[in-house]
Amino acid sequence: MNPDLIRTVQMGPWQHKVDDGLDARKTAYETMYTLIDTCLSKLELQAFLDRVVAGLIDTSDEIKVICHMMLFRLSQLAPVAVTQKLDDATPHLDKTMKGATMTKDTVKQDLERAAELQRSAVRAVVALSKVGGGVSPKFDALVDELKRNPTWSADFKESTV
């Protein structure tokens, strides 16, 4: 993310941040997702996974969802490479599962978007747990926490079937 591409726009009494680089980043991550199916054998997987993990901390929820989908797909196609990056990805997945801070002004659309992002993260964690169980203590703690959490345990069990 390039902070030079973020500008603040005045809309009446409110200020709104506009990310002029979002479309380019989104296209780049969608292209990366396509590369997984078209030329995985030609990719330098560790560098590729570094970019996927970097996408997990992007400010855009859309990019995070694409990265969750990439982790899901890579856990099936390149499990060894993915397990090597579990320690790097776990804090970002955990932060997503903790959710955004909600205030009294939070609108229903924002709540739904946050819930969809968390469901996407659960799907990624379930896929990663199938290949990375026991490899990373941090990741195992996240999996246990999700299984015990009343909000996410049903989604977790549903995704493991």
Language-model features and meaning:
Residues P91, A114-A115, S120, A127-V161:
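Eukaryotic intrinsically disordered, low-complexity regulatory tails and linkers enriched
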Residues D19-L40, L49-V53, M70-L71:
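Amphipathic alpha-helical interface segments within eukaryotic helical scaffold
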Residues T31-D37, G55-L56, C67-A81, L93-M97, ...:
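Hydrophobic residues within the alpha-helices of tandem HEAT/HEAT-like
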Residues M1-A24, M97-S120, E158-V161:
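Acidic, Ser/Thr- and Gly/Pro-rich intrinsically disordered linkers and low-complexity segments
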